[in-house]
Amino acid sequence: MIWNWLRKKKKSNTSKLNETDNQEQHSNNQEDDNKEQTRSMKHNKGKNNEQKDSSQDKQQSAKQGDSSQDKQQNPKQEDSSQDKQQNPKQGDSSQDKQQSAKQKDPSQDKQQNPKQEDSSQDKQQSAKQGDSSQDKQQSAKQGDSSQDKQQNAKQDEPSQSKQQSSGGNSIYDFTKPEKDRIHSLQNLIEKLKKSSDFVNYHTSDDETMPYWISYYRPSLDGEKLQKYLMPTLLERPNASLEELKEHIPMSGITITNDLQKIEDMVLKGHAIIQLNQQDQKCMLANIAIDNYRAPTPPLNESTVIGPQEGFVEDIDTNINLVRKRLPVLDLQTKEMIIGEFSKTKVVMMYLDNLAEKDNVDFLEESLRALEYDQINDSAYLQELMGEKSIFPLYINTERTDRVTKALIDGKIAIFVDGSPSVLLTPVSYFDFFISPEDYNVSWMYATFSRILRLIAVLFSICATPLYVAVLNYHYELIPSDLLETLILSRAQVPFPPLIEALFLELAIDLLREAGARLPMKVGQTLGIVGGIVIGQASVQAGLTSNILLIIVALSALASFITPIYKMGNAVRLLRFPFLAFAEIGGLFGISLGFIFLFTHLFRLTSLRKPYALFYPTRQQSVKDSWIRFPLTMIDTRDVQARPQHVKKAAKGISTKHRSDFDD
């Protein structure tokens, strides 16, 4: 029926065309509409050619108008319907004009006057009757340009839709689809019941009685449930949730209808208690297991003298250990959750009257901006916060006394739930060579120990490269007596010094890794026996010289002298690029390597503070850096952290002659 109506409509329009032949001048004024209609002409090129040949006869054009327009209407309507389906969002003005020219719906025909209908028909005929070649070429070019524009618009459409769908969210889009979203407490419980270790049951066989309990069975502390929670529920069957909260002898009980809070708490070991199964309001009781490892001596930072108290995996226990040592009101904490899946609890701790405000704000902003699936240890935060150097920019410690000392100096501590290590920032290069034991011995021995550590690090980096450089380029620097011994030791070695040094260095690293992965007693035995056997056998086999074996062994021992384990890893790793520099340029190559090393150290920053304290020089920090002054003379805090108050209390008893005691 619609097709018949369109045909009748077209017939009435063609009858009016015979009366308004003089209005063909409107076609020149409406070139834009003609350009837009060329797209349909290009698709129906064969049909248009026939229509152009027949249009030369004015009398036949009136008779054949119905058939030609009816034939043309089908592809036009099909094209317009396809364009609408493909481009539902491209409602620009040019396409509106095309659709209005292609589809003359009844509503538009009723609103437009006969003159407008006549002019539209004239426009169509003028587009169809373009006999000149110039008009044909222009229409073809314009049709191509219009198609290109439409294709570009179609190509831009998916990118715009992607941007709109992302909505400016992070790269980790965990938005749940509408069907998976939780709209009620019952939906949440049904989703939790998909896990086999989730329990949901009624406390009574009578369905009319109250109290439904839901929890995860592995996280259940049976003593809390049977001794504190269940007796109160059974004794008060008609009590409300508020009354139960007052009578249950447990702490941390909350009443809420917040679905997100309920989900977070039940995943942490809380139990859901409902009066009725259809209630949206519930009570949350903490029945999780609280048995954690007790504080033990730190394994990676052992000392002979001083406290032997180390952190554990429970973050609340670690914070309590620090608060026990610093019972002051200014000790503040800021808590946040990091990890898209792990939901790891991270806490910043600092002294509000000492820590610089800019440091606190910048670190908090950096931590909250982190996005990662799982945070298992504090070392994850070190790398995620931009640690790209082989040198650690955060001190990773297990000792409570080191953390309290850093907090008093104005630094910030970062606790991670599940990790026994605490991060300290900002720090300098010399902080990694300071041991907590230095404050428990005399200042002279502490100074000697710190200088010895720095010399040991320098020896560990340079000893083997110097051996390679001297044998390759500077053998004239070796004394004649030592040169003869060195020549005899290398007489049977078939390899160059570089290959010989790499063989022993890699052998030492293999023994170290194997000893660390094996059980403690087996690892110690393997390190001692393996080192002796492999070293003696390699010398007898002529694979290496005994002098280089001694140098490599001393270098390995020197790398273990650093109090912080990660700094020792950096020192051991530096030996290999220095070996390459020594092989290429001798002593000049080693000097070039140190230039690169110091340039890198000068560029490093820890929490936007200079990492290498020897440049720029800070005289106030020298008292407790690579040397240690007596405690009474260390009257200023470490300026590396820019504390609010630099001066600190440092007053002792004078040892001068006092007449009242001596007499």
UniProtKB/Swiss-Prot annotation:
<feature type="compositionally biased region" description="Low complexity">
    <location>
        <begin position="122"/>
        <end position="150"/>
    </location>
</feature>
<keyword id="KW-0309">Germination</keyword>
<feature type="transmembrane region" description="Helical">
    <location>
        <begin position="541"/>
        <end position="561"/>
    </location>
</feature>
<feature type="transmembrane region" description="Helical">
    <location>
        <begin position="578"/>
        <end position="598"/>
    </location>
</feature>
<keyword id="KW-1003">Cell membrane</keyword>
<feature type="transmembrane region" description="Helical">
    <location>
        <begin position="451"/>
        <end position="471"/>
    </location>
</feature>
<dbReference type="GO" id="GO:0009847">
    <property type="term" value="P:spore germination"/>
</dbReference>
<feature type="transmembrane region" description="Helical">
    <location>
        <begin position="491"/>
        <end position="511"/>
    </location>
</feature>
<feature type="compositionally biased region" description="Low complexity">
    <location>
        <begin position="88"/>
        <end position="101"/>
    </location>
</feature>
<comment type="similarity">
    <text>Belongs to the GerABKA family.</text>
</comment>
<feature type="transmembrane region" description="Helical">
    <location>
        <begin position="414"/>
        <end position="434"/>
    </location>
</feature>
<feature type="compositionally biased region" description="Basic residues">
    <location>
        <begin position="1"/>
        <end position="13"/>
    </location>
</feature>
<feature type="compositionally biased region" description="Basic and acidic residues">
    <location>
        <begin position="47"/>
        <end position="56"/>
    </location>
</feature>
<dbReference type="GO" id="GO:0005886">
    <property type="term" value="C:plasma membrane"/>
</dbReference>
<keyword id="KW-0472">Membrane</keyword>
<keyword id="KW-1133">Transmembrane helix</keyword>
<dbReference type="InterPro" id="IPR004995">
    <property type="entry name" value="Spore_Ger"/>
</dbReference>
<keyword id="KW-0812">Transmembrane</keyword>
<dbReference type="Pfam" id="PF03323">
    <property type="entry name" value="GerA"/>
</dbReference>
<comment type="function">
    <text>Required for inosine germination.</text>
</comment>
<dbReference type="InterPro" id="IPR050768">
    <property type="entry name" value="UPF0353/GerABKA_families"/>
</dbReference>
<feature type="region of interest" description="Disordered">
    <location>
        <begin position="1"/>
        <end position="175"/>
    </location>
</feature>
<feature type="compositionally biased region" description="Low complexity">
    <location>
        <begin position="57"/>
        <end position="72"/>
    </location>
</feature>
<protein>
    <recommendedName>
        <fullName>Spore germination protein GerIA</fullName>
    </recommendedName>
</protein>
